[in-house]
Curated annotation (Swiss-Prot):
GO terms for molecular function: alkanesulfonate monooxygenase activity. One of its GO terms (biological process) is alkanesulfonate catabolic process. Belongs to the SsuD family. SUPFAM superfamilies: Bacterial luciferase-like. Keywords: Flavoprotein, FMN, Monooxygenase, Oxidoreductase. The lineage of its organism: Bacteria, Pseudomonadati, Pseudomonadota, Betaproteobacteria, Burkholderiales. CDD domains: Alkanesulfonate_monoxygenase. It holds the Pfam family Bac_luciferase. It catalyses: an alkanesulfonate + FMNH2 + O2 = an aldehyde + FMN + sulfite + H2O + 2 H(+). NCBIfam families: alk_sulf_monoox, PRK00719.1. Its EC number is 1.14.14.5. This is Alkanesulfonate monooxygenase. The gene is ssuD. It comes from Cupriavidus pinatubonensis (strain JMP 134 / LMG 1197) (Cupriavidus necator (strain JMP 134)).
Length: 387
């Protein structure tokens, strides 16, 4: 099992939908979050993409220099960059980071944003272009290890003699991640990507999506790994966790929710439609209505686009829900919490010891170079309580 954290390049706060409790998200703060994730033992971080965010490649390049083992899941955008240029960017980042790049293929579903960026393709055409894009990207990087070149002619993209002179460290290319809920997305995932990502829906719904992607992958003679994107609100007691969830949306008003939902309703995204359905387009507002599955809360999606659900509970409850998703075949968990710096520590301290993680976890055990609390009486090292 791998656990990733999130770099909040679109802002961070203690409350959703208000500037109250917000903090300045400059490079110094982003470095704090990245170094915390690296030190705590998170496998990697997702850096978001889109006009509401800082550029992910620039941010990732800055953060790679201040981290040691942390991997970076960074977006490539079909239609907004050429596949060969994106391949060169990926190869360079992989080389200068010591092989720490993961690539997130993002087709996009916000029509207004896409048109503002110069992309005027409908849903079907965007996925066709994405398929051609990632095929060229993968092939030109694979060829780069032998100083080769490729040519390709498709409906949307064409390259002739494409080359990447400096190959990535990872062979044949950095792993490709991809998320999408439409039939076209599942077909693309089964045919070309390494890890399929889903947003946090109830386990039964997630199981159906994974089964469909597996079916497409089998048809192409492939296997695909799976990941899930979730927020987390974990506290030492269940009551405290639900109080924190209520507090997160306590500054929301009807107008703010309605404005956000109006934007989401215009998107050409099956995944966003499914997220909105979980809270009935913003009409569900009570804890009972927003808890759509045990410990799975849809409150974040009232005003946040994309991943809109959170696991809420005490450490054992949250770990149990994670194991439930793991039993479906998910081995990568991309998590976040508000504010992202504090919650990176909280989740690692409370939940990491309960999960079957790789050796990156530095929290268990008692070593003087690790976390042991404040030394008492000039020489007494604190130990874990026996209660």
């Amino acid at each position: 099992m791998q656990v990733f954290w999130f770099i909040p390049t679109h802002g961070d706060s203690r409350y959703l939908g208000t500037s109250e409790g917000a903090r300045e998200v400059g490079i110094d703060y982003l470095k704090q979050v990245a170094v915390a994730a690296d030190t705590l033992g998170y496998e990697g971080v997702l850096i978001p993409t889109g006009r509401s965010c800082e550029d992910p490649w620039v941010v990732a390049s800055a953060l790679a220099a201040v981290t040691q083992k942390l991997r970076f899941l960074v977006a490539v955008r079909p239609g907004l960059m050429t596949p060969t240029l994106a391949a060169r960017m990926a190869a360079t980042f992989d080389r200068i980071s010591g092989g720490r790049l993961l690539v997130n293929l993002v087709t996009g579903g916000d029509v207004a944003e896409l048109e503002g960026d110069g992309l005027f393709l409908d849903h079907a055409a965007r996925y066709e272009a994405s398929s051609e894009f990632i095929r060229i990207w993968r092939d030109v990087l694979a060829a780069s290890h032998d100083s080769g070149e490729i040519s390709f002619k498709g409906r949307h993209l064409r390259v002739k003699g494409a080359r990447v002179l400096y190959p990535p460290l990872q062979r044949p290319h950095p792993p490709v991640y991809f998320g999408g809920s439409s039939a076209a997305a599942h077909e693309l995932a089964g045919e070309q990507v390494d890890t399929y990502l889903t947003w946090g829906e109830p386990p039964a719904d997630v199981a159906l999506k994974l089964a469909d992607v597996r079916k497409h992958a089998e048809r192409h003679g492939r296997t695909v790994k799976f990941g899930i994107r979730l927020h987390v609100i974990v506290r030492e007691t269940e009551a405290a966790a639900w109080a924190a969830a209520d507090d997160l949306i306590s500054r929301l008003d009807d107008e703010t929710v309605a404005r956000a939902q109006a934007v989401f309703a215009k998107m050409d995204s099956e995944g966003q439609r499914r997220m909105a359905a979980l809270h009935a387009g913003g009409s569900k507002r009570t804890r009972e209505a927003l808890e759509i599955s045990p410990n799975l809360w849809a409150g974040v999606g009232l005003v946040r686009g994309g991943a809109g659900t959170a696991l809420v509970g005490d450490p054992h409850q949250v770990a149990a829900r994670i194991r439930e998703y793991s039993e479906l075949g998910i081995d990568t968990f991309v998590l976040s919490g508000y504010p992202h710096l504090e919650e990176a520590y909280r989740f690692a301290e409370l939940v990491f010891p309960l999960l079957p993680l790789a050796v990156r976890n530095k929290l268990p055990g008692q070593v003087l170079s690790g976390p042991f609390g404040e030394v008492m009486a000039t020489g007494i090292v604190p130990r874990a309580s026996q209660s």
